[in-house]
């Protein structure tokens, strides 16, 4: 989990656009965040397996 100070720091507007980065809305993880959902891959996997994300299902071929 991300520290509270890092979450607050991310919430502030960045002085330069290149300094802005995505952070998971659920756990605050800064890496591997899907832009479409706004959550990291770990939270995405957990929510998808539980059926909490509508329209998302496990693929098999």
UniProtKB/Swiss-Prot annotation:
Q: Which cysteines are joined by disulfide bonds?
A: none
Q: Which Gene3D superfamilies match?
A: 30s Ribosomal Protein S14, Chain N (4.10.830.10)
Instruction: Give this protein's Gene Ontology molecular function annotations.
Output: rRNA binding; structural constituent of ribosome; zinc ion binding
Q: One GO CC term of this entry?
A: cytoplasm
Which positions does UniProt annotate for Zn(2+) binding?
24, 27, 40, 43
Subunit structure, interactors included: Part of the 30S ribosomal subunit. Contacts proteins S3 and S10.
Q: What is this protein's function per UniProt?
A: Binds 16S rRNA, required for the assembly of 30S particles and may also be responsible for determining the conformation of the 16S rRNA at the A site.
- Give the protein's recorded name: Small ribosomal subunit protein uS14
- Natural source organism: Mycoplasmoides gallisepticum (strain R(low / passage 15 / clone 2))
Gene (UniProt): rpsZ
